[in-house]
Structure formats: structure tokens, C-alpha cells
Amino acid sequence: MAQILAPSTQWQMRITKTSPCATPITSKMWSSLVMKQTKKVAHSAKFRVMAVNSENGTINRVEDLLNLDITPFTDSIIAEYIWIGGTGIDVRSKSRTISKPVSHPSEVPKWNYDGSSTGQAPGEDSEVILYPQAIFKDPFRGGNNILVVCDAYTPAGEPIPTNKRHRAAEIFSNPKVEAEIPWYGIEQEYTLLQTNVKWPLGWPVGGYPGPQGPYYCAAGADKSFGRDISDAHYKACIYAGINISGTNGEVMPGQWEYQVGPSVGIEAGDHIWASRYILERITEQAGVVLTLDPKPIEGDWNGAGCHTNYSTKSMREDGGFEVIKKAILNLSLRHKIHIEAYGEGNERRLTGKHETASINDFSWGVANRGCSIRVGRDTEKNGKGYLEDRRPASNMDPYVVTALLAESTLLWEPTLEAEALAAQKIALKV
């Protein structure tokens, strides 16, 4: 016997008053029942808890309601407001009804939440205001329902400390930055953990699989763990309108990567945060824990990064390789500033091993995955293209990283003396 949500009396077409148990409603009957509702009835229909028996035992109708598409029966939509929590890496969300479909964030009303419950405001002044900034189709509810990526402000309109989008938007709206149309391609790595033991998916509990080597981009039950989650996430992002461009299994078993981009300016951060939220929801449903820890397992195992590919209009045009080298020079001079902004716990990952450079030293190279900045062979050959910043950790804030790259390469200028010394140090001719 199970308690389920069932239509009120006028909708119980196959339930008799004399029967001690409700007649089971099949999936076909349930669909027929729903399709017969008019908009008027859909608004007024009440649901109550009832018990249902079946020949096979208990039937749980919650799934039927979860899959119920409300779009044919109402103009109202459900908007899931998403924001970044107090740790700066956690995602929070809550839902509200909006009276009609929307096509732009400006049509979505501001909202608020209890910041004292997320570590973002004191209890005596706990209200934090959500400003809608980007909308995506909701892959979980379907129809006209939406996901709304927001940033957070005090009631006075000041961005709260964890709102990194506000500063990023200022940088991306600078005329010098706008003129260069910065592109970003972000490679988000993540690790899947078994729920109760917090140990990587596919690993023996308390033990280790065979050494790294056979797992990268592999197929097979003994080499690939979590493909269903990766693929579900891929399709959900495409449905949502996120600019996801690919996915692959990573070097460490139980670790995966997806790529978002190329995206222009602030859009890169919006799309990464929306994709992270969707991934959290999918792992929630799958009963698997998601971690963005940059080094989830100590020892001879790869860490998890968020490599960020970056180019400007000048880099993509003829002669762009010289512009790229000048950008690399600027990045070398601001290495410490970037490292401090590139994610928590990154020192455990950037050791100079496992396809990383040392956190303390800046380096660059062509096709060298052991450098801070990698330039592809095609970029060198064509004399134009992009650079890859391999320093960001998997838990980095994409608003911070993308904006800092633009600031360091387009808005910040070193002294001639510092530039000359840096060029000599990293063997870079500009």
C-alpha cells in the first residue's frame, strides 16, 4: 500500500464508493485522465492523498506527476531561480510561478531568499535580493518552464561578497574588452563519488583500481564509470540551450569532463554555472555525489581542473600569435594574482606532475600539458588562434577566471622594465 497524490473525487472516474481499495489507475488511464482536463479545470482541480493497490504490489504515482507537462493546460510557468551559495561554489535554487512564458531575463521578476541560511547575511538582516541574469529551458520540467541564473545583492543594491558576476560584467562592458570580443572555451572536470562512502564511482570501497592508463576516453564496464550521468547531462544541457560542445571520460577512473564554448564574455560564466546546476540535479536523481575538489584522491592520480581556452579578435586574426605572446607575458607578470583567484585547494593539484605545472612557477609552451599556458600546434602553425590557461581548478568561479583573463591581457599594462625582465625569464620574444 502506498500513499500517492490523486485527483479529487470528481476525477476518480474508476473508483467506486463501495470498494475497500481503489482500482489501480494504469499509466494509460492516467494519461487519458490528464489529457481530458481543460485549462479551467486544470486551475481548479484539487489533489489529495490516497492509497492504491495493484496486482504487483504498491504503485508509486509520484513519477507520473513529475513527468506531467503543465504547458497544455495553463499559461503559467515554473521558474527555478539559481544562485551561488555562501561557499562560493555551492548552487542553491528555489521555484516560483510566473503568469506567462518569458523570453528574456528582464521579464523575470526579482526575488529574495534567506541569506542567513546560506551564510550570506546575518539573521537580523537576512534578506538577499536575486537579480535574474540569464534564462535556460528547464530540462527537468520541460514545456515552457525555465531555469534562471541570478546574482545576489543587498536590499540597497550592493553586490554581496559571493557575487563575482557583478565585477565580471563591469570588465566585459569596458569598450576595450567589448571591441576584442573575447571567446572562452571552458573544460569542466568533475569526479563522481559513491554516496555513503565518498569514494570514486567504480572504485572498490577502501581500495584502488588499477593504475591510470586504460580509463581516458575508454569504453567497458571495467574502465568507464558514470557514462550514463555524463550522457544525461550532455543531452540536458543541449536541451536547456547551454553551449556545451563535448564530453569525455578522464584519466582518473570515475572522473569526467565536459566543454562549454566558445562563449563570448559574461555568457561563459552563466553557461558554466547553469551546467553545474544541471549536473548537481542529475547526480541527485542518480544517487551519486558530485565533487569539484581539484585533488579528490591523493597519490598517483590526476586532479580535476577547469582549463580555460581564451582568444581575442586580435589573436584570431593574421599576426595573432604575436598578440598571444604579449598576453602570455602579461599573464606571467600577474601569475600570483591569477593563482589566488583560480580555486580553493589548487596547491594540491598544481604540483608539476599529472599534466600540471608547479603552482609556484609560471611557464608556457607549444603542445606542452605540463605548462601553465599551452599553445596548440595549429595556433603556432597558422600564426593565430588561442591560448589555454591550464591553471584553474575544477572548483574555480568562471566569472572570476574569464574576467581576470580579459583584465590582465586587455586592460592591464606592465612597465617596460618589468616586461623586459619577464620576457627574458620565460624565454619569450615579443
UniProtKB/Swiss-Prot annotation:
GO BP: glutamine biosynthetic process
Miscellaneous field: In pea there are distinct isozymes in leaves, roots and nodules. Irreversibly inhibited by the herbicide L-phosphinothricin (PPT).
Primary location recorded for the protein, binned into one broad class: plastid
Free-text function comment from the UniProt entry: The light-modulated chloroplast enzyme, encoded by a nuclear gene and expressed primarily in leaves, is responsible for the reassimilation of the ammonia generated by photorespiration.
Name this protein carries in UniProt: Glutamine synthetase leaf isozyme, chloroplastic
Assigned keywords, A-Z: ATP-binding, Chloroplast, Ligase, Nitrogen fixation, Nucleotide-binding, Plastid, Transit peptide
Family note: Belongs to the glutamine synthetase family.
Source organism (scientific name): Pisum sativum
Highest taxon listed in the record's lineage: Eukaryota
E.C. numbers: 6.3.1.2
Molecular function GO terms recorded: ATP binding; glutamine synthetase activity
A GO CC term assigned to this protein in UniProt: chloroplast
